[in-house]
Amino acid sequence: PISTNIVQRPVVTGVTALGLDHTAILGHTLEEVAWQKAGIFKPGVPALSVEQPENAQAVLQKYAKQVQASSFQVVPVNRDLLHVNLGLPGDHQYSNASLALELIRTFVLSDTGKQRFPGASEKLGCTGASVPDLARVALSSAFWPGRCQVVPAKEAFHATYYLDGAHTVESVRVCVQWFVRETAQNKQPKVLVFNCTNGRSAYFLLDSMLEELKKCKVDA
């Protein structure tokens, strides 16, 4: 697999939601992408993933077994997180946050984690299932410019910008859902500024956007 392997000896590895991206390198199906992404899994190292489409998840699990990862775990959404106001908008971020918590939990409970950060498991409350206070603060204050970002209107322009760097069919759908929620009470005219970089299909991205707008009963 052609995966990004910056850390040669990881303590734990994780894969977030898969989508069709960089298809010239990663492949043209979700299963091919999963195989390439699974390249970060290492022998004797726990392998984690968010819930994926069935076929893609099977590929991840197969690769984890092939390289003899110490375990393969599918991390569901942590229900306790649903009461946390995440800094990054979007329902999918609860899945990402759940994976992040499990990665941290696995790390601090490992031999390496205990050696480098003694007492961290107690401070972070990693022995329980609830979300520790420190994690709540971190997740609620997280900010990623260009991801579901709102730039408020200035008096001179009278225009509020809703920015997102979605570049896959899946992330475009999530972007539309976020935008519709954010502007539900805003009856002002809306203008779409769309940019597509080389190597991606503007047709499929825009088609996905229009489909989602129709589902949300928004005229486009």
Each predicted region: which residue ranges?
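Nucleotide phosphate-binding/pyrophosphate-handling subdomain across enzymes
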Residues: 2-14, 18-22, 32, 81-219
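Internal gly/pro-rich beta-alpha loop/helix module
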Residues: 11-12, 24-106
